[in-house]
Amino acid sequence: MRQLMLGNKALARGLYEGGCSIVSSYPGTPSTEVTEEAVKFEEIYCEWAPNEKVALETAFGASLAGKRSFCGMKHVGLNVAADPLFTCSYTGVNGGLIICVADDPAMHSSQNEQDSRHYAIAAKVPMLEPADSAEACEFAKAAYEISEEFDTPVIIRMCTRIAHSQSIVDTKERVCPPTKLYEKNIRKYVMTPANAIARHPFVEERTARLAEFSNTSSLNRVEKGSEPIGIITSSTSYQYVKEIFGDRVSILKLGMVNPLPEKLLLDFAKEKELLLVVEELDPVIETYCKSLGISVHGKDVLPMTGEFSQNLLAEKLSKAFPKLAELIGTIPSGRKLDEEIPGRPPVMCAGCPHPGLFYTLSKNKCTVLGDIGCYTLGAA
């Protein structure tokens, strides 16, 4: 059945279709709706954890018991969950384990603009990055297969625009693999120094196998264009590039952003008169390409901060490259509304019991230090 779905809802659908049994998450925009949608499936047990570290530990425990599990959080939540993330990279999994982290370029509801791809690189775990709702659903199922085949947790990186945009999803039936029985394996699952030393070579060997997988996986694809110009991109940026250039340039669309596909990148770079990397936030793909000796343009013409858009890319690329200016032409600026839509900054949720406390603290001119976004709103 074809349905119009938010990216987060589609990801929850992918968890259901992929046989997920347990979801443990900590809420935070733009990740929250994944768990809110997953709880609607009777076959999935869902809970909110007291923090992201506990959420990942709960999901990891379910994985050890042989169940396919999931935990979700926003980008800053991965800071809190970093301890178990790095350790379960060494231990590996039993049942498939997905960690969803939702980045927030332009900081619509966040205190920083950190790029979660660095965590996947540092922890040496695979990361998938969908570019629309259909991929969010399919990548969830693919992540479970990768997790169990390579004995690793898998991170799915969402972002605000993918999480909160809608596109068509072809829904399918749930496929639930047999539960893998738990085996007590101290050397694999208890990371004392001696055991961790023995597991580290496994992590390095696994990374090499994942890199080979990335080279041939259908998660990454090449779309050939009519001009000798190539663009390497992923996630939301792919949609902007496609809308601007259509089929006129060749595009390497990356769905697996760690490990990056070395051979595929080198092959794509051949016979290109101009090669660009279009990615929001940090130059992760660009830096890797340059480490391979590939000459690319990226952050020398595109901003390091904020979100991209069709107009922003068209303006920056046209100014930097006359050849692209010819291909781009004029991008319509869009219609102007008779009345501007008022801004909708974050507010306390309806029914929240805490505004009274914040009012009292403010009235008494108290200075209070907090951590999560709700406390930040109290400052207003």
Where do the PLM segments sit?
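Flexible, low-complexity linker and terminal segments
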Residues: 1-8, 12, 17, 130-348, ...
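Thiamine diphosphate
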Residues: 22, 29-148, 358-359, 367-380
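Selective for proline/serine-rich intrinsically disordered segments
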Residues: 25-28, 199
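Short coil/turn segments at secondary-structure boundaries
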Residues: 26, 219-225, 371-373
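Residue-level recognition of beta-strand->loop/alpha-helix junctions
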Residues: 27, 73, 253-255
